[in-house]
Regions:
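Helix-rich cap/lid subdomain of alpha/beta-hydrolase
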Residues: 146-199
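Conserved HGGG/HGGXW glycine-rich cap/lid loop of the alpha/beta-hydrolase fold
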Residues: 30-76
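Catalytic active-site module of serine/aspartate enzymes centered on a nucleophile-bearing elbow/loop
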Residues: 263-295
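The conserved beta1-alpha1 loop
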Residues: 43-45, 111, 242
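Active-site loop/oxyanion-hole signature of alpha/beta-hydrolase fold enzymes
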Residues: 14-15, 22-26, 34, 68-110, ...
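Conserved serine/cysteine hydrolase catalytic core
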Residues: 206-259, 268
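Alpha/beta-hydrolase fold catalytic core
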Residues: 1-40, 61-64, 103-104, 286-295
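Conserved hydrolase catalytic core segment
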Residues: 104-149
Length: 295
């Protein structure tokens, strides 16, 4: 029995069974919490889920009180249709969740789509409307500056008038081909990894809403001044960890960060792509731990 349960640790089933659900606007949101120490909130990317962080979970929970959720429309959370999905709404979700837990100060560690949510939360803090304090921020391969974001063709198609057809007709093969393009050569996913990512994407008919979720690319352009301004005005410690082999938001994004963010702190990971925390978890953890020790 012990060996069987040991085998289950680290599986998608283990991840789901260790979670709890809460309600947001009448919709079920999946979350996980573990560890002791200062609260650390993990924010996942598109089109995946909190599962992206599972390889770092044992490392992070040894050091911090780690909290993560699947945003509305992602992973094991509800994926309502119709629904007006937006970065601002996801920020409302995090704001309500964090304040509801009674947390007064948190650290944020964000990837991709989660970086945009973090920028919105940071802007709210600077406006004095956030009910908690952001102590530090670490970004992972986020499209922080839309002018140097290079979306894949499939992402452009999802944004087009054909988006609904593309979303509903997305095959496992097409998904896997495009997903692998995002990754570096260091640690490619195996078949089980791709099974897990596909299961999360298709859970609760998630495939049918991708064209709604991807409106965030337009939101980034519309809110650029607000969200980039938030980075430039930030007073708390910030670090960007960049997998520079990422074709979408890798080396060019890191260069732009250095150009626009005062006292830019950037760690570049060679041969690592868009999912550094999945591809090279120990390197990302080392970079994050060093960042926190400097504070």
């Amino acid at each position: 029995m012990a060996s069987r349960s040991a085998q289950q640790v680290g599986t998608l089933e283990w991840w789901q069974q260790g979670g709890k659900w809460f309600s947001y606007e009448g919709h079920a949101i999946f979350s996980r919490m573990a560890g002791q120490g200062e609260p650390l909130i993990l924010l996942h990317g598109f089109p995946t889920a909190s599962w992206d962080w599972h390889r770092m979970w044992p490392m992070l929970t040894q050091q911090y009180n780690v909290l993560v959720l699947d945003m509305l429309g992602f992973g094991f959370s509800d994926k309502p249709v119709p629904y007006d999905y937006s970065i601002e709404d996801q920020a409302d979700l995090f704001e309500g969740w964090i304040s509801g837990l009674g947390l007064k100060t948190v650290h944020l560690f964000a990837h991709d789509y989660g970086c945009s949510v973090t920028q919105e939360l940071l802007a709210r803090e600077q406006e004095g409307t956030l009910p908690f304090r952001i102590a530090s921020i670490c970004f992972l391969n986020g499209a922080l500056f839309p002018e140097v974001h290079h979306p894949l063709l499939i992402q452009k198609l999802l944004c087009s008038p054909l988006g609904g057809l593309i979303s509903r007709g997305l095959s496992r093969r097409t998904f896997e081909r495009n997903f692998r393009r995002l990754l570096g050569p260091a640690n490619p996913p195996d078949r089980q990894d791709m099974d897990d990512f596909w299961q999360l994407l298709t859970y609760n008919n998630g495939r049918g809403i991708l064209h709604h979720l991807i409106h965030f690319m337009e939101e980034r352009r519309c809110h650029r001044n607000r969200w980039v301004g938030a980075l430039q005005k930030a007073t708390q410690p910030m670090r960007l960890v960049s997998g520079v082999a990422d074709p979408v938001s890798g080396a060019a994004m890191a260069r732009r960060y250095r150009e626009l963010v005062p006292n830019a702190d950037v760690v570049s990971l060679r041969n690592v792509g868009h999912y550094p925390h999945f591809e090279s978890p120990w390197d990302v953890f080392s970079a994050y731990r060093e960042f926190r020790k400097q504070q």
